[in-house]
Amino acid sequence: MVVVAGMLASCSDSAEGVWLGECCNDTIGGSKSGVKMSVKQNEDKIEGILILQDNLYGSGHFVGYINGKDLTIRSEGDTQTFVNITWTGKMKDGVYKGTYRVEPTPSAALLGKQVQKGTFIMRRQ
């Protein structure tokens, strides 16, 4: 499951569109990887695809809802994901930035995956 959480700057801001950016993994020496999020928004409902481009965690489909200024997105990852990812940040003026935390599922922990955290920034394309 991939979990994305953040804040919208105002109710009029939309998360709709393609977001491209970069993650910096503080746990393993600041290594960087690309991230892409494709979002469709229908009023307060959000859905889309999140792809981590380093192939360490795969991709996942997510659905979520906006409640006022809060944006919370939770998703089930595909069979190659095996982790829960929480993104916490702010979306404002076409930029989404903040921190993330990766927690392995029990099956991924058995394969040696560990908790990781870092920062991210994505820009609307």
Language-model-detected regions and their locations in the chain:
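C-terminal motif of bacterial Sec signal peptides marking the signal peptidase cleavage site
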Residues: 9-10
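Bacterial N-terminal signal peptides
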Residues: 1-6
